[in-house]
Amino acid sequence: DFKINGNDIFTRIKVNIIDLLCGTVQNVSAPDGRNIRLTIPKGTVPNTKFNVPEHGLPILNHHACGNFIIETLCQMPNLTDTDVSRLKSFAEQSKIFDWQISHINI
């Protein structure tokens, strides 16, 4: 699914939460059929937009093309109660989060 704005082409890809947290490389099909090898760094947040220059539509009367912009959507897993328990235990033991929900003032 592609959208066009001027000479830029936009698309969205689903990336699972583990790949957003840990980083990954994903192949993305461009509208012209080329495969774009997209490196998603660890800690990428959902809705991050990656810009691939010169992979959009040709710019009239120029020797250049627009950009191909790829937005990441977070694909959440369906977790069982056991999965949730294991994730909570891992988060507490590994101390990957340096904050606690109880300390947030709203």
Regions found by a protein language model. Give the residues of each.
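Intrinsically disordered, low-complexity linker/assembly segments
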Residues: 1-106
